[in-house]
Amino acid sequence: MEKRAGAGIIETADVDEHCEALRPWDLTIRQVSPGKYRARTEYVSFNGFLLYREQCCRRLMVTGATPAGYIMLGSPSTAEARIDWCGAEIHPGRLAFGGSSTEIDCVVPAGSHHVVALMPEYLARTYLGEASGSKLSFSKCRHLICHPSVSESLIQLVHRLVHKYLECRELLADREVCKASEFKLMDTFVQAADTMDAGVGCVSARERHLAFLRAIEYAEHLQRPIGVSELASAAGVSRRVLELAFRETLSVTPVAYLRLSRMHGVRRELAAAAPDSARVKEICARWGFSEPGRFAVDYGRLFGESPSATLRTCSKPLPIRLKDALRGRVMR
């Protein structure tokens, strides 16, 4: 498969023609239901990726192998449609999956509309990281279990990208636009792959809560912004499990909590600093906040005062503490 960019539409009138059109797949397609054959494939390729959406008017039995050097994700275009892929029905929450040169078989119903994403295997491993990439068996897995919202995101993303580049093919010459599309695709893949190692249903509420505690401990003194994947790795669970743990416990996302934690770090440092020598902007920058104006608004909404007001109260006496009262040190 060439890495140059391109977009187009392929229309075929028999299964053998369709087979040839789908190369680099190595497939045998058998038409099962009677009638004149028609298939339409709308595709786009960029940065080594090949995305397409396909319509087939007849029921098909397909056998063969996925393209060498690529992994694939696929799904029917609608939640109601079903495709039998390697012995299991593909539906929301279950994506068709295959590694490089993986033997596959599937039954495609008449009138099927489906989407497929092919991505270079080396890129998939790079985005996943060595640890996750080795756990996800590209040669053995045929199905990728994920949250239904993730599979829906993949479907809609492929539809959007194919439509976008078919309508405006000159965008394929824009490296930044293509790179942004690559990031979106790989982010969706990483979200889906996270659930391969630790399904949400396999992790008890107690284990999720312990993972939540490990995550907030890890985040407590982080000054730099990090992603959810790093936080999940530190907590020893998948991204999806960590997101559920945060929703169950705090009703916030891990991303929101990470920002909240760093804002508290700024507040602690402002409260401990000397007003005549410290600068709010510098303290904010140390904690990874590069937009002082936006930060000041968020800070005021959270703490009810501006960052500069916190800095000015550094000499404020400590409040009465309950332990002081218990020790009889408070006399009023």
Model-predicted segments: where are they?
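Short, conserved glycine- and acidic-residue-centered signature motifs
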Residues: T66, R208, R259
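Short hydrophobic/aromatic patch on the recognition helix
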Residues: L242, F246, R294-F295, Y299
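Short, conserved beta-strand element in jelly-roll/cupin
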Residues: T66-A81
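Conserved short histidine dyad/triad with adjacent acidic residue
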Residues: P34-S45, F49-T66
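C-terminal flanking helix
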Residues: L250, L258, R262-R267, G300-F303
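Alpha-helical bundle regulatory/interaction domains
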Residues: M1-K36, R82-R239, E248-T253, R268-P292, ...
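Solvent-exposed residues in well-ordered beta-strands and their adjoining turns
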Residues: C56-C57, P76-T78, M119-P120
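Short glycine/proline-enriched turns and hinge-like loops at secondary-structure junctions
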Residues: G64-P67, V108-A110
